[in-house]
Amino acid sequence: MIQMPPLGGIFLCNRGVMTLAATRLIALHKNKGKSVAACLKSRTDYAQNPDKTNKGELVSSYECSPLTADEEFMLSKRQYELMTGRRQKNDVIAYQIRQSFKPGEITAEEANKVGYELAMRFTKGKYAFIVATHTDREHIHNHMITSY
């Protein structure tokens, strides 16, 4: 059982070891010369790279399919505009949370669960997100991308 304080890095994993994860919130912006859809696809494709996520086994999601998350994020933006008549005023297209763990302190599967719980706390269950756990470096780390 993993216990976490509100949007923090300290948690208690099931082995009874206290751990601190480096966590960073990043606003994702549209790149010049690219559409919002192309930027979202690029970001979600990078996060879900099969070479970094054990062939996709370390990807989880909430209220969207990992296979179509970028398209679903775009649909959500369009629905917001239609329902409210308002467009987003800033150029933030999504948010990413990156979470890194010290080498050897957590398994990839545990890291994905911790990332999912953190993304759920951040979104309060109101927004779709994906969590992709990367194992391509010495330290295991998560990329969590959420629409808003």
Task: Indicate where each model-derived feature is located.
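N-terminal nicking endonuclease/strand-transfer module with a His-rich metal-binding environment
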Residues: 2-148
